[in-house]
Amino acid sequence: MRYLVPLLVFMVLGMGCLGGGGEEMVKVSSVFGNDEFIPAKYTCEGIDVNPPLRIEGISENAKSLVIIVDDPDAPLGTFTHWIAWNIPPVEEIPEGIPKQGEVEKPIHMIQGRNDFGRIGYNGPCPPRGHGVHHYHFKVYVLDTTLNLRPGATREELEKAMEGHIIQFGELVGLYERK
């Protein structure tokens, strides 16, 4: 536990390496607070839809947003639950984005393949009895749109984002299956 705070500080400061440094933070919020439990509705024990996300403080230089949701507490290492890109720089990502490669409504975005092997959002679903998991809802603000096909991988997305991140923010939600 005593190593967690320095690690988080290092990770946030280290984000400058992806974007060339100097990017500002955006505030990300939802129906749950930072370090609070995610309502079951947004998990495999509910209807498994993405929660709404509110993003405050987006730069006027923003061309698009990227969302990456992952669980670093997964038994086999960090598990990716959702990747989406080419989202217009809007302040609200609505709940229940369709699980398809290219989405036009309720908001435009392109989605990639998560670690369940599916396109779109699949919510928290930690192994029963594995304890509390931390789900990181990361929002990257880019100075460009990305030329990636629907269904691309997280690795392809991260490579395409290099040098284009101008802002970053995240919200951490908790979930446990007993």
Curated annotation (Swiss-Prot):
Domain of life: Archaea
Record bears the keyword Iron-sulfur: no
Pfam families: PBP
InterPro entries (UniProt xref): PEBP (IPR008914), PEBP-like_sf (IPR036610), YbhB_YbcL/LppC-like (IPR005247)
Parts forming coiled coils: none
Keywords, sorted A to Z: Signal
Signal peptide range: 1-22
Family as reported in the entry's similarity comment: Belongs to the UPF0098 family.
Record's protein name: UPF0098 protein PYRAB11530
Organism: Pyrococcus abyssi (strain GE5 / Orsay)
